[in-house]
Amino acid sequence: MQKEQRKFTEKTRRDLESGCNVTIVAFGDSITAGYAVRRGFPYFWKEALALKYPEARVEMINAGISGDTTMDGQSRLDWAVLSYEPDLVTINFGINDSVLGLGLEEFEMNFVDMVRRIRAGPGSEILLMSSQPLETPPYDRLVLDYYQAVRRVATQMNVGFVDVYFAWMEKVREGTPLGSLILPGLDHPNEAGYRIIAEELMKLF
């Protein structure tokens, strides 16, 4: 799966390998912003990229805002993402949309709109992302429908998809307790959980 997804980061990888300046915008909600932690996945991802590509200069812009939905993402896409003319954009929404009851069809349309607008810009590569499992089973089942919708959009629009949910569940199947990756009572990743997200992203680099 990761090998197949690497084609969506080909240009960015080439620039990193050449020691160029690379701008990445991590766009999303509190999972991207990093809720109640000092270091979220953009921090660990940038750290890993710097180790692998020491000659490159990576500007990692964290454009996550807690509580945001895809509708909020649409409204701030121009100034939060496109204004930076990024080489690569990650888009990560879904949990808040599911909790607020936004219909799946509208949710998918919002993602399609954001992808189209980014494509009309400076030629950024695009990775869509699911988020982590939730500890409460009914909410986890609900949000999984939204994660699957993100995957559908990625396939439809021919952009990358990073399956964070699957990566976490692999760790759980290997014996890591889900609760050890989540902030107590908050259903948000702790730093150990964020490291898994960064590791999954690095499989494309």
Where would I find each of the regions flagged by the language model?
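Alpha-helical cap/lid subdomain in secreted, periplasmic
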Residues: 7, 47-56, 71-205
